[in-house]
Amino acid sequence: MWRWCLLLVLTLAAKAAGQMPSWFFAAEGLRTTEELDAYRNAGMSALWVQVNYRMDGDFSDYDALLDEADRMKFSYIVALDLRPPPMLRQTFRCAPHDPAYLVWLRRWLDTVIPHFRQRPNLLGYALGCEVDEAVSYDDEGFAFFLQSRYQSLEQLSKSWQLPVNSWLVPQAVAMQADDQQLPLQYGRPSLDAALYRWTTLHNLLTLWAQEVRRRDSNPQHLLFAGPLTTYRSLAVVPPDYQGIIPFLSPERAEADWLAHNCHAVAVARRGGRFIVIPMLTTRLKDGRIILPEALIRWSMAAIAVGARGVVFNDWSAINDLPAVRENVAALISRVQSEVPANASPVTRTAILYTPFGEGTLDAQGFPLYGFALLPGAQTQPLRLTWDEPASLFFSLRFNAWGTVDAITPFELTPEILSRYRVLFAPAAAYLEPAMQANLANFVASGGIVVADLGLGAFQAEAPFQTFPPTLRELFGLTVIRQLVVGPSVRTNMVVVRHHPLFPNIPEGFEIGNQVGSFGPVLGLMPAARAHYWALLTVARTGKRFVKQGGEVRALPGIPERAAVLINPYGRGYAIFASTFLWTLWSPKDLGFDLFHGSLIERGSALRVVGGFVTNVWVSAMDKGILVINPTDTLQSVRLLWRTPVFYALTNATVRPISTLPLVQEITLTLHPHDWAFLRPIADLSPPFEVTTEVKGRDSLKLRLGGALGGRVNVRFWLPSSAKSLQVVIEQNGTTPVSYTHLTLPTNREV
């Protein structure tokens, strides 16, 4: 009896959840049942249903829409705006420490969640909507934070090295205290203010997830955080969520009309920890509709860095213009048929992104990347890392070896670190002891990490000048004795010692440009255990007095250097630069490509033939290779791929370059704004030049180049859904052309 009841409950729970589409395509703004047919014809695979606060709790209009969606077998996400509605924003604050907000939130969720949770095709909930900008990072919350972090005012005063008489310290006052005592204008009080803002947003997102789960415990109903409109909010989403919806529109964030700030997807994935479905701009604020080729390019860029689909932010923009609607439908159909479900990028390089430095500000002065600054007018002048880490994301997101991942300090776990060979760590200021230990183990196991100024600042005794013991040992450092700060501080880097990590950078090579690629902060260090690889500047501070031949002589002080150091650690290397390395340094500068390329290629099997910056975007994925032409011109693409076996790839010609190791050359031609997914369809032994042309869903044509010198074994790779495969094999060479027609059941060798 009990066993039967349990099965019944489980069956009912399973029925009360929609199926996640293999590729999630949706558009915001669908309101009426009459549009559902057009919505389906546009290729959409799911519904995005925005539910705003209603005092009366009447959702009858949504019920009519979702009843029809259920009949048409559409799954849907219910997007809840959990910010206080405009009429109540003067009454309470959007903050986890505001009791009035908690009362309102719980009442609203008590109304909306029970209404929708039993719907049969509910995929889950999206919680958010420009939450970072709406959160009240107020000084009352800062006081609560300080009380929880420090046991007494005496401890707070000791940590800040300032007399503090009350917990009610305004953040601006705390940060101005740093301005008066530190050359970098950033010390312990400012670090605490930044950590407060970071923690507040994290706690609010955690609160939302927990409150929703209390009212809907069905684990098949996914929780998505978003749409989130700052990179720093993507980096603090807690593990209570299964997915994230980034919306970094070029209208509001960086004006990246080429790729719609697609690195937001990499940030949100956090090394594959979250499902990511970005929202894309479809209509501008002035009413203009985005061109179809831009929507196609943005969608494919997002998929290349790991998106599971996209949400278009305005359904009417798609529905109103036939050209847009038809192109979107064709794009979705092609993705669903050509790109395997759940295809994910595979890269051995990641950026360790700490949401600290300001990076870039939006038009209203809101920091997009880090919590170091107060939002709004108080952000000026910039006082920390300027354009870092934004500059690094843009420089590396599509390079000659493919894509890069992004992880936060909370992904510094053995499991996630095992996926990478190289970590670039701009301003890695927050590293708890366990994170430091995992980072050291990563390097000892053969990894390479590149860090710069600010390393471990939160955990250091003197931020930006000393280092926690584990990091000091890992990087072979001592101390930074002096910080040279100023807008005119600019210099280049001169290599003083050749190193095998950089085989193409000789001793004496100058990295930079005519005005200097490094600054405006330099940290001067005395001699360290790690080897100096390159020097930024050398200074002698003070004088030394020595006694020689009965006389006291004054000699120049001990030299202190701003430099890049390389420390061998276990089987790997830890590299440290005593400046904000990527504030000014870009791919346009001499040596940028040699430095980064030498490291990235160590873990990469794929490479685009050409320069560091390529005309095409390439993503090596676990089920093939995605190649995108974002330009207005025809592109001939040539790739080199190191693999254990020799593959025939759809849409490309493949020929062997070498056998030990096995390297194959892949060539194809892409029309403007076009893309191709190169899927392994067969492997050949021995390696032999082959061109594959897909003739239909279950039909292929293989053209073998050159004359056969013997037997060639071809093993076909077919999806499990394939019932049969018709193959035409054409042989070109000195003998007349011959054709072989085969009809194969799946998993057959010829």
Q: What are these model-predicted stretches?
A:
Residues 429-510:
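A glycine-rich, often tryptophan-bearing local segment used as a flexible ligand/cofactor-contacting loop or short
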Residues 292, 318-346, 475, 539-700, ...:
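Extracellular ligand-binding/catalytic regions of CAZymes and related secreted enzymes
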Residues 35-42, 46-93, 208-209, 213:
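Aromatic-lined substrate-binding rim segments of carbohydrate-active enzymes
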Residues 740-746:
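Conserved small/polar residues in nucleotide/adenosyl-binding loops
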Residues 89-93, 216, 222-391, 511-516, ...:
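Hydrophobic targeting/anchoring helices
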Residues 95-99, 103, 107-259:
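Polysaccharide-binding and catalytic clefts of secreted carbohydrate-active enzymes
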Residues 19-38:
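Boundary/entry segment of secreted carbohydrate-active catalytic domains
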Residues 24-25, 48-57, 90-104, 128-133, ...:
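The substrate-binding groove and active-site-proximal loops of carbohydrate-active enzymes
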